[in-house]
Swiss-Prot record:
It catalyses: L-glutamate 5-semialdehyde + phosphate + NADP(+) = L-glutamyl 5-phosphate + NADPH + H(+). InterPro entries: Ald_DH/histidinol_DH (IPR016161), Ald_DH_C (IPR016163), Ald_DH_N (IPR016162), Aldehyde_DH_dom (IPR015590), G-glutamylP_reductase_CS (IPR020593), Glu-5-SA_DH (IPR012134), GPR_dom (IPR000965). NCBIfam families: PRK00197.1 (NF001221), proA (TIGR00407). Pathway: Amino-acid biosynthesis; L-proline biosynthesis; L-glutamate 5-semialdehyde from L-glutamate: step 2/2. This is Gamma-glutamyl phosphate reductase. Pfam families: Aldedh. One of its GO terms (molecular function) is glutamate-5-semialdehyde dehydrogenase activity. Belongs to the gamma-glutamyl phosphate reductase family. Its EC number is 1.2.1.41. It comes from the Bacteria. GO terms for cellular component: cytoplasm.
């Protein structure tokens, strides 16, 4: 088994260690803010190459994490998020390549105007600074967050879950070597070298001004803790209670395909559908939709109308409408048209991702305009709630708040702006 780093079991020096990491990251952020796009892209090219070359090393490290997690009795959905395969490592490398192709936003003048006194004002994109990313079981987050922050000129401090510690360390080694090949500082992408949970609290404190933004990736308990305790801004979503509404004007075959994909493509991702809403005007669609789900191995929990259509449907409780299962389970309910669907989502949704399936353009427009979620879709699966699918290369998370970033947080969303003003000696009267 890979030898643990010194702080893995806790250390009286942990506050000093974390403050030192933040200090080094801040220094690296100053370098990255001025690094040309070509230099950052050289680092990304090297990272992609190293990830591909070391797939066996990464999977071996991950296998140790998986063995330990199984012994701890983790759930099947958690195990799916933790496990790396050759295909998933290849996808990680593909994501790095995609980020490399994204235009560098830093230094871009997004708007420019001249005032009556002759001054020219420019609004220019700049990095946020140092970003702290706290995540749980998904080791691929280490790569996604690392390269997105690099491309956007930010330094990042990664604090992965103890379950994925070895996997993240193997991935991080590739990222750091890529930085070195491009002549960029190691501290541009820092992995907290400990499983000590106290490190999370220290990171949330902002480390004496060393961290500018926190991004949590994990379950609702982690996200709730981050939002409650963080002393710096947070980009986060609490959970993904996502809905697919099948309207009376929906094509049945399209609806079956979308519902099946939205729920069962990957049940453990935040874009998975958790509730199926069916228009009362199309109750003939209930049975085939339920058949499609149950035949794919999904448990369906429904209201009386859904249960009347299929005896295999289990009764839904009030809690089911508010549950993010992250498993092969879905709640199903009959509603009174698009108005009923919107009302249900307003009462039980999490402002993440919701979809309507319909051929009625007016119903689709009403749904898209009135559902207050970061991502709303017409005739498409909720599993497209992903930065890569948006053309962002990858994502550091899905933000469901309304300040600064909303939806998939990619390279551009990890920037802010400043104003540059050019004068010719103007003074204010």
């Amino acid at each position: 088994m890979t030898a643990p780093l010194k702080a893995i079991d806790g250390s009286a020096d942990l506050p000093a260690l974390m403050n030192d990491l933040a200090s080094r990251a801040r220094a690296a952020a100053r370098v990255l803010a001025l690094a040309p796009a070509a230099q950052k892209n050289r680092a990304l090219e090297a990272m992609e190459r190293l990830i591909r070359a070391r797939v066996d090393t990464i999977i071996a490290a991950n296998a140790e994490d998986v063995v330990e997690a199984k012994a701890a009795g983790i759930t099947s959905s958690f195990l799916d998020r933790l496990t790396l395969t050759p295909a998933r490592v290849a996808a990680m490398a593909d994501g790095i390549a995609a980020v490399r192709e994204v235009a560098d936003p830093i230094g871009i003048v997004t708007e420019s105007w001249q005032r009556p006194n002759g001054m020219t004002i420019e609004r220019v994109r700049v990095p946020l600074g140092v970003i702290g990313v706290i995540f749980e079981s998904r080791p691929n987050v280490a790569a996604d967050a690392g390269v997105l922050c690099l491309k956007s000129g930010n330094a990042v401090i990664l604090r992965g879950g103890s379950d994925s510690f070895r996997s993240c360390r193997a991935i991080h080694e590739c990222l750091v070597e890529g930085l070195r090949e491009a002549g960029l500082p190691d501290a541009a992408i820092t992995l907290v070298p400990t499983r000590d949970r106290a490190a999370v609290g220290l990171l949330l404190s902002g480390l004496n001004g060393g961290v500018d933004v926190i991004v949590p990736r994990g379950g609702k308990n982690l996200v709730a803790r981050v939002e409650a305790e963080a002393r710096v801004p947070v980009f986060a979503h609490l959970e993904g209670v996502n809905h697919v509404y099948v309207d009376g004007a929906a094509d049945l075959e399209m609806a079956k395909s979308i519902v099946l994909n939205a729920k069962m493509r990957r049940t453990g991702v935040c874009g998975a559908a958790e509730t199926l809403l069916i228009d009362r005007a199309s109750q003939d669609k209930i049975k085939p939709l339920v058949d499609t789900l149950i035949n794919a191995g999904c448990e369906v929990r429904g209201d009386d109308a859904v249960r009347a259509a299929d005896a295999r449907v289990k009764p839904a409780s009030n809690e089911d409408w508010d549950t993010e299962y992250l498993d092969a389970v879905i709640a199903a309910k009959v509603v009174d048209g698009v108005e009923g669907a919107i009302a249900h989502i307003q009462a039980h949704g999490s402002h993440h991702t919701d979809a309507i399936v319909t051929a009625d353009v007016a119903a689709a427009d009403k749904f898209l305009n009135e559902v207050d979620s970061a991502i709303v879709l017409h005739n498409a699966s909720t599993q497209f709630a992903d930065g890569g699918e948006f053309g962002f290369g990858a994502e550091i998370g899905i933000a469901t708040g309304k300040f600064h970033a909303r939806g998939p947080v990619g390279v551009e969303q990890l920037t802010s702006f400043k104003y540059r003003i050019h004068g010719t000696g103007q003074t204010r009267p």
